Amino acid sequence: MKRKNIALIPAAGIGARFGADKPKQYVEIGSKTVLEHTIGIFERHEAVDLTVVVVSPEDTFADKVQTAFPQVRVWKNGGQTRAETVRNGVAKLLEIGLASADDNILVHDAARCCLPSEALTRLIEQAGNAAEGGILAISIADTLKRAEGGQISATVERTSLWQAQTPQLFRAGLLHRALAAENLDGITDEASAVEKLGIRPLLVQGDARNLKLTQPQDAYIVRLLLNAV
């Protein structure tokens, strides 16, 4: 049986650093929200079988998303943290039979709306059949400094450092097990949860265009990238 590829987009955050009057995933860029741009990436990709968006139970914007993408599952069972939101989404996929333990879950930040299709293809091709899973990442190009009290305390050796991106691809069963701990403190992405099990996920070459909309000034770059597509 063919292993399914299921995109899971945690979208329960409030995006406080972005400073808008609504969660950043619902900020409009052009005629669509950031989240709609992100969903479209997966809906257009032939290797993705299903897209699921997990939002907060109090979300008042999700109905528009469901109307725009009636085939997408939009669930209001998000948690207080990203890890909780992903855990809830994976658990429901397994519970209702939309995913088996052996299917691939591709967890992607709602605010990464410029993911190139070729980067997504590369991740699926290189990590889709790997039991340890894998993530998109790019090597660090800039010099990194460690700071104390607003002053440089050290220069960090960057040779072996990579910047994690999303999607992060793991088997549903593995991801469910990795996120099953009651205390998810320190889990900043899915790979870090899997690493705690002693597993070493693959690094797949990402793309600099796959940036995360975090600060207000990022919106300018995102607009340029989306207009260039």
Swiss-Prot record:
* Site location (Positions MEP for the nucleophilic attack): R158, K212
Has the keyword Transferase been applied to this entry? yes
Keyword set, alphabetical order: Isoprene biosynthesis, Nucleotidyltransferase, Transferase
User: Recorded E.C. number(s)?
Assistant: 2.7.7.60
Q: Where is this site: Transition state stabilizer?
A: R17, K24
Family per similarity comment: Belongs to the IspD/TarI cytidylyltransferase family. IspD subfamily.
What's the protein name? 2-C-methyl-D-erythritol 4-phosphate cytidylyltransferase
